[in-house]
Amino acid sequence: DPLADNTDLYAFVSPDEPGTVTIIAAYVPMQLPHGGPNYFGFGENIRYEIHIDNNIATPGDDIIYRFTFKKVHEDPTTFFYIRLGAQNHKTTYTLERSRDGGLTFTTLIEGGIVPPNNIGPRSINGPAGLNTTYAELMENALATTADGERVFCGPTDDPFFVDLGGVFDLGDMPRQDSEPRDGVACLNVSTIALKIPIEWLQKDGKTELEASSILDPDFVIGIWASASRQTIRTLNAAGSESYGGDWIQVSRLGMPL
């Protein structure tokens, strides 16, 4: 299930804002930025979630950030991804947050912007395309919630280094006859990035300045990411699909880097 596949999870104190934690969850591996005509990315009818456990006295997660995505085709008359200011596979997201382990959710962002793939200068910069810069598209995709969380969802270069050819060639690593090669170089993943104030993650709402030490157990959190689908998919006679049933986890990744 590539669209629901967790690739990597990262969590660290933000180097530019020590009062926040940055969490990055990557999905949908091995994407070519110019990989038309399908342009794989975040899937519809999938719940992408980041789970946070900030209280060792209670089981399970305490905070959940849930992302769901929608796609529209602004110019269905063409197979081009972008043309004359219109974008196909245009993706937006809704962000919800639970602070009671998933019992209730509050909507933080609706209609969040997912930037398009950087498929080439004619499509991004040219007058027959979007007539802008990719830097501006990425900047416009940054969002801030009313509570101060910073959010980004979109395609990014896969930051991981792994010699996939060596790994799956009977564990040929380091390579016996050549240098290691980055198997994910110049390939994208679909990234969910959050920058969250520490007081929103600490169980009692304390800031980092209130920690007794770097090992203060009240400031230790557990983080994992998941993707879930509903159990029933119906292929309708007209060619459309409908979904129902319980939501079941189909991908999970912990032990953040």
Locate each region found by the language model.
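Surface-exposed extracytoplasmic segments
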Residues: 1-257
